[in-house]
Design a protein with these regions (language model features):
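Ribonuclease/tRNase effector modules and their secretory precursors
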Residues: 1-89
Length: 89
């Protein structure tokens, strides 16, 4: 199944600290998370070990929300959270 990344998703990815490669990885290998309004969601935790906005974070959690339209996955948006989780990619 193909993945179509909406321009809105890419804009948010840049603002929030992720990229197209991670978005595709989350969809393909992430774990399912609850989503509203009939949408689907997946998340994945990555090692980060860097500063972001003048604070150090061990990990980041990337959450992607999407729909399935025919034979393709179409992204809606992406969220990125910084902190420390148990699950690591």
């Amino acid at each position: 199944m193909g993945i179509q990344i909406d321009p809105h998703t890419l804009e948010r990815a840049v603002e929030r600290g992720t990229n197209e490669e991670e978005i595709k990885d989350v969809i393909q290998t992430g774990f399912s998370i609850p989503a509203k309004y009939g949408k689907l969601g997946k998340a994945k935790v990555y090692e980060f070990k860097k500063n972001r906005l003048n604070r150090y974070f061990e990990q980041k959690r990337v959450e992607v929300f999407y729909t399935i339209e025919g034979d393709r996955i179409v992204t809606i948006t992406v969220y990125v959270f910084y902190g420390k989780w148990e699950e690591v990619a």
